[in-house]
A protein has these predicted regions:
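Mobile "lid/hinge" segments at catalytic clefts and subdomain interfaces of large enzymes
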Residues: 38-42, 46-85, 177-254
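Structured core elements
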Residues: 53-55, 101-103, 157-160, 175-176, ...
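Extended amphipathic alpha-helical segments enriched in small hydrophobics
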Residues: 113-125, 217
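Flexible, glycine/threonine-enriched loop-and-boundary segments that flank and lead into catalytic domains
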Residues: 163-172
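Catalytic-core signal marking the mid-to-C-terminal active-site face
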Residues: 212-302
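Catalytic alpha/beta active-site cores
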Residues: 1-109, 113, 134, 139-146, ...
Length: 302
C-alpha cells in the first residue's frame, strides 16, 4: 500500500501492536508458538526502519495495579523474551530490537514515574547491547560504536498512557488533575508518544468534549510549557537521579529473578506474573482504604 502511494518508506513512522504474550497473560490464550508469525512480521516490515511491530503492553500491568518497579521489571523481561526468541529464529539482533516497542502506563506518582522512564531506557540499552547488534547501515551511521554495535538498536521506543487504575467514578473531574500530572511526568521523562485517557472513561464512552479536553491537556504541555523543546530536563536533579537508580535496581532484581526462573513466557504460563500483580492490586486497595496511599477526592479532600 505504502509503495503504491509512493511514500518514502524510510520516513514512515507507526506501529502494529502485535503482543501474543500480553494476550496470554490477560486472556489466558495459549499463543506460545508465536515466533513464526513474529518473525514474518519483522521481516516484512524491515524496509520501514521507523515502523515497530512487536509490542510490550506493560500498561496492562499498570492498569491492573502493579507497583512501578514491578511494571518495569516485567516489561524488561517481556521485551527480552521477544528479542531472544527472534534472534534464536534467525532475525539479526539489530533488526529485532528496532521492531520492539514498549507501551507503559503512567501512575500519579509524579517523580517516580519520571524516574521509571529514565531507568527503562538505561536498562533496555544494557539488555540490547548484550546481543551485540551490528550496524550494517550505509552510509556509515554516526551512532555506530567502535566495536560495531548499533546504538540505534539500543534506543527504547516508549509510548505512555495515563492509568485507568486510579480513575474514579464519583467526582470524575478530579481525574483531570491526575491525568494532567501523569502526562506531565511522561513528557518530562522524554517518552516518544503519550495518550491521555478521557476523564469520563470510567462510567461512559468518552464523548467529543472529554476527548477534546484529553487532547488539549497534551497541547498545554507542548505549546504553553514547551516540554518538547528540552531533552531530559530532569537530568542533574539529585532527587530524580537517585530515584532513577533506586527504581532501576529494584526492576533489575525482578528481571533477573524472572530470567533465572525460565523467562517471561514461562512465568506467564505458570501464572506467576498474574499472581504477583493480583497481590499488588489487593495491597494497593488496602493502602487506599487505610489512607496509606492517597487518592485525591476519595480518601483525601473527598
Amino acid at each position: 500500500y505504502f509503495q503504491k502511494k509512493g511514500y518514502d518508506l524510510t520516513k514512515l513512522q507507526g506501529s502494529v501492536n502485535y503482543d501474543p504474550m500480553g494476550k496470554m497473560m490477560v486472556k489466558g490464550k495459549d499463543l506460545s508458538n508465536f515466533i513464526t508469525t513474529a518473525k514474518e512480521l519483522v521481516e516484512v516490515l524491515a524496509p520501514l526502519p521507523k515502523f515497530r511491530c512487536i509490542c510490550v503492553n506493560a500498561i496492562e500491568l499498570n492498569n491492573a495495579g502493579s507497583y512501578i518497579s514491578q511494571e518495569l521489571g516485567y516489561a524488561l523481561a517481556w521485551g527480552n523474551e521477544y528479542l531472544s526468541k527472534l534472534v534464536e529464529a534467525g532475525v539479526p539482533a539489530a533488526l529485532a530490537a528496532k521492531k520492539i516497542k514498549f507501551n507503559f502506563g503512567i501512575s500519579s506518582n509524579y517523580f517516580l514515574e519520571i524516574a521509571k522512564f529514565r531507568a527503562a531506557r538505561m536498562l533496555w540499552a544494557d539488555i540490547v547491547k548484550e546481543y551485540h547488534p551490528q550496524c550494517n547501515r550505509q552510509p556509515e551511521c554516526p551512532n555506530k560504536a567502535e566495536d560495531g554495535t548499533c546504538l540505534c538498536a539500543c534506543k527504547m521506543v516508549a509510548h505512555a498512557e495515563t492509568s485507568t487504575f486510579n480513575l474514579t467514578l464519583f467526582d470524575a473531574h478530579v481525574n483531570l488533575l491526575r491525568t494532567q500530572t501523569e502526562a506531565m511526568s511522561a513528557a518530562l521523562a522524554g517518552v516518544n508518544s503519550i495518550t491521555v485517557t478521557p476523564f469520563d472513561k470510567t462510567y461512559e464512552t468518552p464523548d467529543d468534549f472529554s476527548e477534546r479536553i484529553a487532547r488539549n491537556q497534551q497541547l498545554l504541555l507542548k505549546e504553553e510549557c514547551h516540554f518538547n523543546k528540552v531533552v531530559d530536563p530532569a537530568a542533574g536533579s539529585y532527587f530524580i537521579e537517585n530515584l532513577t537508580i533506586s527504581i532501576a535496581t529494584q526492576a533489575w532484581e525482578l528481571f533477573l529473578k524472572v530470567e533465572d526462573e525460565g523467562g517471561m513466557l514461562e512465568a506467564i504460563k505458570a501464572g506467576k506474573v498474574q499472581e504477583a500483580i493480583n497481590a499488588s492490586n489487593k495491597a494497593r486497595h488496602d493502602s487506599v482504604s487505610k489512607r496509606k496511599e492517597i487518592l485525591l477526592g476519595t480518601n483525601q479532600y473527598p
